[in-house]
Amino acid sequence: MGDVLSTHLDDARRQNIAEKTEKILREFLRFYEDQYGVSLFNSMRHEIEGTGPPQAQLLWRKVPLDERIIFSGNLFQYQEDNKKWRNRFSLVPHNYGLVLYENKVAYERQIPPRAVINSAGYKVLTSLDQYLELVGNSLPGTTSKSGSTPILKCPTQFPLILWHPYARHYYFCMMTEAEQDKWQAVLQDCVRHCNNGIPENSKVEGPAFTDAIRMYRQSKEQYGTWEMLCGNEVQILSNLVMEELGPALKTELGPRLKGKPQERQRQWIQISDAVYRLVFEQAKVHFEEVLCKLQLARPAMEAVIRTDMDQIITSKEHLASKIRAFILPKAEVCVRNHVQPYIPSILEALMVPTSQGFTEVRDVFFKEVTDMNLNVINEGGIDKLGEYMEKLSQLAYHPLKMQSCYEKMEPLRLDGLQQRFDVSSTSVFKQRAQIHMREQMDNAVYTFETLLHQELGKGPTKEELCKSIQRILERVLKKYDYDSSSVRKRFFREALLQITIPFLLKKLAPTCKSELPRFQELIFEDFARFILVENTYEEVVLQTVMKDILQAVKEAAVQRKHNLYRDSVVLHNSDPNLHLLAEGAPIDWGEQYGDGGDGSDSGGSPCPSEAATLTEKRRRAKQVVSVVQDEESGLPFEAGSEPPSPASPDNVTELRGLLAQDLQAESSPPASPLLNGAPVQESPQPMTVLEASPPASPLRHLPPGKAVDLEPPKPSDQETGEKVSSPGSRPPIHTTTEDSAGVQTEF
């Protein structure tokens, strides 16, 4: 690898890449500085005017998945340095970074991991044919001939490959199809979460960045959705630079690569990854400098906005009226002829899989609570409630149980419309809908938790508890139906705008864009940081198509075909005291209602071994799902299949009947299997993880020489990939783009 990089990425070429990167970054960051002032003004105006969607009926969890591990188990990873497949103990902590250890013993002994992979921008592939096609397309003229040796050989029929257009690739394989399906669901969850790297609570920096990306690409005549708008700001910015650098670099270096097609492909992957690292480090430095400068200037900008808010609004409305008078006739004709006829078909294509997915979320939630209620009847009531609720609280983050919901979005197609509206891929819409599904599931679960916790304060009997669970379930489902309708309608509107607005801007650009500079004189110089002609122009274009989009969504709600509430149905303060319940401390079901202390003597504390067992049991209860295998097995065979669940009642009426029958029985029936995400096979292991943090949290570097805690490392969202340390050593984990003694940052 070193020879390839030293040959094709010498100092002169690296300097040339750095200069081109510098030019692109400076051009983009001018857009970002412009958009920052506009975004700050919009945020403050929104805060003052108080406009926004209807109040949600469900509660939301302020600290989701605190101290949780999503998944753990063994898998084979291909080592590119020695071209060997090695068994790795792998786990996914609450921040969805895939952490790879040498083995389970290394994890238990607190040895630093081999790798921590941030999967933003990656695709999860399940066949070598898919991978070879993408690799062949990445470097023209290297498609392998039939019968020739491929770039990668997999020892089993069940590979999983993480592919990235610019960064290095990761190769895994499993021994069974069932294990492949499980890990595929887990890795897709990681990609989905890491792609959503810009925090939603970033009301200024986030919108400013995404608007700057859009404006910059439009200045290069690139309209439509962009598939690589994924990850945190530095990752997205690196993708933006590589989008421009990649083709020229490929043209320059492609003919110089030597060897067979598969060898040239391997060399290009190494070169692209090395360039991506260089670009990432450069983008990180420049972005942080500009962001720091803007944050220092923010207080002065806020003072101007507060003082002159009314004048800024008046000035902007005056500018909008002038632009509207100029472009409205052209825009209306364009909407009428090229957009309006296609809105119903686009909406229908979006609504069918999305509504099916949200219905599946409702069904899964209903089934899990129903099974838990039956288990409360069968297994001793409140004594086991803590264990059941601990598992139920993790339902939204259980990749296997949520997979049936996510799969409903896979059939989404915009056949015949993608080329017309320049939609490169539907993946951005699929992932957004899936994130909404997970959020709504967690909101429903958390609301159920909160209401049940309040009910438990009354000291109910087992019979009263079961009736209360059923009553709370019905109450939460009504709230879910309303919130899911609001979320879906908002998603449909946003998706339609995301599809149609770039198309309209591209259509209008030849006749309108050249005329925009003359409107600049209408903006007072003092307000020029908060009002931009280009943004106002886009808002006017948006307004021309918005009424058609709103009308289409409204008509869909009237039909009730997809269980959407009409806009006139607004549940104002239907449960005014509910949100007050969420202000308390998070509920720890294992601590408050667990049965871990029953076995200890009343006269004193448990012995050290018993205390360790109780601690280990509590930690295992906080793992969402596990397929951990024994180290002696050596191969990642499937740990086992979950016990089949008894037929669950399909509706509330049937459940009431079952509950009535069970409560009338004199003795409880034999205990049934717990069906709320219990791991099939577990091995005692440390399960403490770092505190929860938003997606864009920085990496916490370990000081030199300090032992690693029991906590699995977090993948830094300021990193674009993995950290690698040599086995058996305990070096500090730090950021670098070059090989260092025992530590290397991988992407």
UniProtKB/Swiss-Prot annotation:
Residues 589-747 are annotated as: Disordered. Coiled coil: none annotated. Residues 68-192 form the PH domain. Keywords: Cell junction, Cytoplasm, Lipoprotein, Membrane, Myristate, Phosphoprotein. It is a lipid-anchor. The modification Phosphoserine is found at residues 568, 574, 605, 626, 641, 645, 648, 667, 672, 683, 693, 697. Residues 593-602 have a biased composition (Gly residues). One of its GO terms (cellular component) is plasma membrane. GO terms for biological process: gonadotropin secretion; negative regulation of apoptotic process; negative regulation of cell population proliferation; negative regulation of DNA biosynthetic process; negative regulation of DNA-templated transcription; positive regulation of DNA-templated transcription. The keyword Acyltransferase does not apply. The keyword Phosphoprotein applies. A lipid is attached at residue 2 (N-myristoyl glycine). Residues 708-722 have a biased composition (Basic and acidic residues). As apoptosis proceeds, degraded via an proteasome-independent pathway, probably by caspases. One of its GO terms (molecular function) is transcription coactivator activity. Residues 734-747 have a biased composition (Polar residues). It is found in: Cytoplasm, Cytosol; Cell junction, Adherens junction; Membrane. Belongs to the Niban family. May play a role in apoptosis suppression. This is Protein Niban 2. It comes from Rattus norvegicus. The lineage of its organism: Eukaryota, Metazoa, Chordata, Craniata, Vertebrata. The gene is Niban2.
